[in-house]
């Protein structure tokens, strides 16, 4: 995320960070993520953004594309108690092994705007989360063979 904020001006603008000298470091981003998780705010934030987009006619709801992205972490990643985080697991993608989590995403097929996000361990099969990524109003759902 730190690199994305550095590389993509639109991300900085969306986050209200302004210039390059106000960018948070990895530790600040991680603390913020933990606060979002602790107070269950991420789903509420996504819901508020999506409501704004729908009100402006940008979220069409006629089709959904679903996919997952691997979020790799160092295998030594530990939680607050000093033990390995039980939510992170190992998985194989192609011929390469990874340790971490997966982000399963549902996007509006026409606009490409994200409407649903589900986080799981990296070893969870993409197909098992497909039902959670659709909103039920679609005429079409698109997915890869994953």
Mark where each language-model region is.
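Polybasic low-complexity intrinsically disordered regions
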Residues: 3-6, 15-17, 21-146
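Short alpha-helix boundary/capping elements
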Residues: 9-10
């Amino acid at each position: 995320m730190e690199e994305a904020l550095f590389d993509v001006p639109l991300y900085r603008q969306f986050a209200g960070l302004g210039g390059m000298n106000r960018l948070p470091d990895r530790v600040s981003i991680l603390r913020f993520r933990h606060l979002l998780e602790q107070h269950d705010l991420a789903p509420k934030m996504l819901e508020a953004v999506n409501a704004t987009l729908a009100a402006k006619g940008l979220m069409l709801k006629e089709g959904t594309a679903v996919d997952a992205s691997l979020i790799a972490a160092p295998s030594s990643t530990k939680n607050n108690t000093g033990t390995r985080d039980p939510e992170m697991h190992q998985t194989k993608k192609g011929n390469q092994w990874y340790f971490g989590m997966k982000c399963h995403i549902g996007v509006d097929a026409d606009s490409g705007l994200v409407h649903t996000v589900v986080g799981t361990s990296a070893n969870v099969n993409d197909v098992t989360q497909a039902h959670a990524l659709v909103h039920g109003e679609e005429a079409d759902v698109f997915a890869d063979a994953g």
